[in-house]
């Protein structure tokens, strides 16, 4: 809103909160808003419902608020570019998130006894978004695989560790890539410092290589667990998880 005050052009707004933008709607601005669990556009005194979030796979049935934000921005921009609301609605309903369509964006792999999710979150804001999503997920135990990026500030790495400890029950730290001028030990120590802000005896272990960390998480995961791999090399993580899922599928077929 502060930025808008300094702009000299036509401005459209989007928000998760109707109260935040109701005055803008009354003033005649084009607005996309999350209202009554639906994506709605207000434009030229018209109220244009687009879709209920339960019909938008990208939002994970409305559980991923940051994905709703992304959808709002995309819908509003598309609508103002002249695409018909019906076309937008149909596109949202048929765009299915997957490792192929949206690699590294909440890719969920369903194993027989547990699930694994891969996401590209690698900064404090990304970790908080994942934390908010996981708060809606029921699981026996939530296991996180995390790492740090070397060119981040100390406080950012600590914040990632702290948020990880707030959303997971067990953490595997891996750190083989993106050292960017720091040593593996320094990055890990900063993550651990953040973890210990939550609990001094929080359970974690260090497995440097991502492939080995993911394999270990699959070995220790129990029925009803939810594993989250926050990866900075998404293609590798997807390939590894898919390999183990294919192995399990083949084994179940043979038994």
Q: Where are the model-predicted features located?
A:
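Extended acidic/charged loop-beta regions that coordinate divalent cations
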Residues: 1-57, 94-109
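ATP-dependent carboxylate-amine ligase
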Residues: 53, 57-58, 64, 73-86, ...
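Conserved phosphate-binding catalytic cores of ATP/NTP-utilizing and phosphoryl-transfer enzymes
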Residues: 67
